[in-house]
Amino acid sequence: MQSSFKVFLKKSMPLNETIKHHGLIIRVAIPSPLRRVFDYLPPIVEQLSIKPGMRVRVPFGKREVVGVVVESAQDSTLLPNRLKSIGTVLDREPLFSSALFRTLLWAAAYYQHPIGEVFQTALPVKLRSTEPVKVDTTVYRVLIPLDGDISTLLKQAKKQKSLLELIESEFEVNENRIKNAGYSRRTLNQLMEKNLVKRYMVASERVAKFKPPTSASELQLPLNDAQKVAVKTILKSSDSYACYLLDGVTGSGKTEVYMQLIQHQLANGRQCLVLVPEIGLTPQTVSRFRERFTCPVVVMHSGLSDAARLDAWNHSREGSAAITIGTRSAVFAPLANPGMIIVDEEHDTSFKQQDGFRYSARDLAVMRAKKENVPVILGSATPSLESLQNCKANKFKHLRLGERAGVAQPPTLELVDISQSILESGFSEQLLFKTQKQLNANNQVLVFINRRGFAPMLTCNSCGWIAECNQCIAQLTVHAKPPGLRCHHCGTIEKLST
């Protein structure tokens, strides 16, 4: 793998003369501020074969840490008696695909960050210790086949009958599949109470891959000419790398373009990764995707518990999740069979990690798509200058959606000079008049204000302290009703001390 991998190792290894060894040397990336890998001997007790991307527990100074295997070699800068042995091999197989592994090596070199910390960032919190990757997963199977007697029993319970038919047709389903299909927990419990369905615990690797949709969704909307051109152009390279900047005005139907492209990938059994800039956008995005597609959709962002993030990570890695939606950290989500990466609102600065391992999720998404050999779509109504320059340099392909989709019309804008006006609670006479006119016609009015909250920040005048979010280091905004501090970046809420 002579590429950024070897280049990184050459740069990170000490300049001492190397010593040939008769046995195997394992190079491990340790989560430390040192920009290098560390040499170890294989475990004293024979274990599984060690491959790059597997976690190992190793002695490091006076403590033991969990690192990631980078490569094996026949030489080291240390004498054999100075090398320590790996304590435990924690995984049966690499946690990263070859493409994702190479993306992380590239990121460490490009962003000049210690390789061990890069690998740690890419892993869920629970996997940064000795937590096993494989977790037991709950699945449900039919105990009694759906025959005439059972159909009669469930004649008045149509929801129960259709859920039973679903489980029987797929042999076994997990809770995500049941939820995504629109069935409640109560319906499932009623089937179990009647001894028609039983719950089983199985290892996560036995959970079946998602079932590709057999036909287009009934919710699919007709495309205008510009949308058709965008979809047709992107589908030409649906099996190989290409980067597209989907430049569309607000309301131009970028999401519908995403949906139809994803539909094509799912029909071919391939997974899709969708990145959104903020946690606040995730629920509405997930809701639209789950309503549109019957395939499992998982979510990955910092607001989830460690256990929930590991579960989503596992489903994505094993291929049981068809679509993974998340914020910037989801760019590291493992995909069993990747088909497409989408970065919505690619211009948003929230895609940039500002502390620790500093990276741009948008740029990493492009590089990862290149390593995975899949298309990547960057969507925006106000594209970043970097992306526009890449289009000029023919690195990206520029697709424009210049008109609003459907029957939507561009708004009529009116600029009101309030410098000489008397305002009422901050509103001009013209605004109040036109607002009342719409209300009298039973229409709705949406008023945007230039600031959310009572005050933009909470600060101490004596020492200059500013209240910051413990989750993402953004400034907290003061809200009066209800009183509290809120992070407009990640959604964290804290009490307002008096």
Residue ranges of each PLM-predicted region?
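Conserved coupling segment at the C-terminus of the helicase ATP-binding
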Residues: 382-383, 468
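Short amphipathic alpha-helical segment that frequently serves as the phosphate-/nucleotide-binding helix
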Residues: 43, 362, 428-432, 466
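A polyampholytic, Gly/Pro-enriched intrinsically disordered region
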Residues: 317-324, 421-424, 495-497
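C-terminal boundary of histidine-terminating zinc-finger modules
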Residues: 415-428
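Short, charged/small-residue-rich alpha-helical element at the C-terminal edge
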Residues: 249, 432-433
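Accessory, non-ATPase domains that flank or precede helicase/AAA+ motor cores in DNA-metabolism machines
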Residues: 1-380, 387, 392-408, 439-440, ...
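Cys/His-rich short segments
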Residues: 431-432, 440-498
